[in-house]
Amino acid sequence: MSHRFRFVALVFAAPAISHAQVGRAGLPQHFEIDAAHSMMGFSVRFMGLSNVRGAFGTYAGTIMYEPSAPERSSVSVVILTKSLSTNSTSRDQHLRSPDFFDVERYPTIAFRSSVVHQADSGYVVDGDFTLHGVTKHLAIPFVMLNPPVSDAWGNQRMTFQGNLRISRKDYGILGTAFWNSEFDPGRMAVSDDVDIELLVSATVPNVDKWMDPAGDSLIKEINRQGVSATMAQLKAGRTSNPNIDSIGPFAYVVAAEKLAKAGRLTDAAGVYATAVELKPHSAMLLAREATLFARQGDRARALGIFEQLRQLDSTSTIAAEWLRVLQRK
């Protein structure tokens, strides 16, 4: 399985780690960027007459938030380049071609923060930005539109807005000579400067609102006969409940996360252990099992599983951020 396929699967299949307040004190809160309510947009001047606006539709991002010490917060983001859209099919195809983004050769754009510091109007996030195979240091100013608050579904949600300008030529995004020609003084076919607009909404979900019949049935079986017996039946392929005979990764996540939120960490760990044994190539399950161990204070096991996740999916922002947190402890 390619890294790109795993990346897309993880974006759409993996809600954020939910038991952010369970376990050891001193660990940051783990937020995942909610792509459905965020925007990674750009704008470039066209012919000196108008702006072409676009955005990327597929991306993942992890924020490790330290509310009492924001400067210790960190973030990693990975964007799928082929997900760009400018509301023109022919233009999008051209932008994806080797003339510009060359998405087959450079399938992702990435940002990894190095330091966060407060500024007059908000925060500045310094870090390494990789685009078109070129990595440069960027300082991105952000304003926090709202600190973590509960939304209508009980999810913890915080929102940031940021803007910056980069040079496309600094990253080797050149196009043909025509697109770099100057028709009149100061009027380029496509400007060198690209304005980037970021609206980031990040969440910690309320697992009580997760609806999954198989996951809820799994909890009922665990309550009825214990986690060991239930997991043994699943591994043997023989259960007493047809609703859990053949369940997917998300059902395991629902069951384990609800058990963890209820303080039943040992039962949650048992669910994840079986799930990973049965579905060893699920990045979502590995991420959640590792996070549970991190919250329980089992640093060595968490590190090992996050390393395994990084080997499975090099684009995993969850693995990147948790490894950073655990390695500095």
What are these regions (language model features)?
Residues 21-217:
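Low-complexity, acidic/polar, glycine-enriched regions of mature
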Residues 249, 283-284, 317:
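Helix-start (N-cap) detector for alpha-helical repeat units in TPR-like alpha-solenoids
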Residues 254, 288, 321-322:
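Canonical tetratricopeptide repeat
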